[in-house]
């Protein structure tokens, strides 16, 4: 499940990306933060597993730069989400091979961090 970021986001608006993003609050685990933001952004809860982490740095067109430790959390959910329009403009189901082809053909449609996440996750799976 991919989401398209809302038009009013301060960076990377209207770009396609991972299902949700979060930063843990004080005393909150990475998985707890992921569950919280999944509910806030996509309107559902599911069990999540932390499968890997990595550090990335990416500059944005608005002069900001992100330099973060990212965790990739995986969960399973088969129903349509109830998106928060302040966070999400649209969503879609996508197969990994279709994502790979679309990123190759249209990298400008995806967030910088998602392109890194997708590549790292495929490497981990051995694709």
Please report, for each region that a protein language model flagged, where it lies by residue.
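Nudix hydrolase/Nudix homology domain
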Residues: 14-16, 20, 54-60, 64-127
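Acidic-residue sensor for enzyme active/binding pockets
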Residues: 28, 40-41, 68, 87
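A broad structural signal for alpha-helix termini and local helix breaks/kinks
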Residues: 42-43, 77
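Structural signal for conserved beta-strand scaffold positions within catalytic alpha/beta enzyme cores
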Residues: 2, 50-52, 93
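A short coil-to-beta-strand element that immediately follows conserved catalytic motifs
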Residues: 44-54
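Conserved Nudix-box catalytic region and its N-terminal flanking loop in Nudix hydrolases
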Residues: 1-36, 40, 105
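N-proximal short alpha-helices
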Residues: 3-7, 11, 46, 64, ...
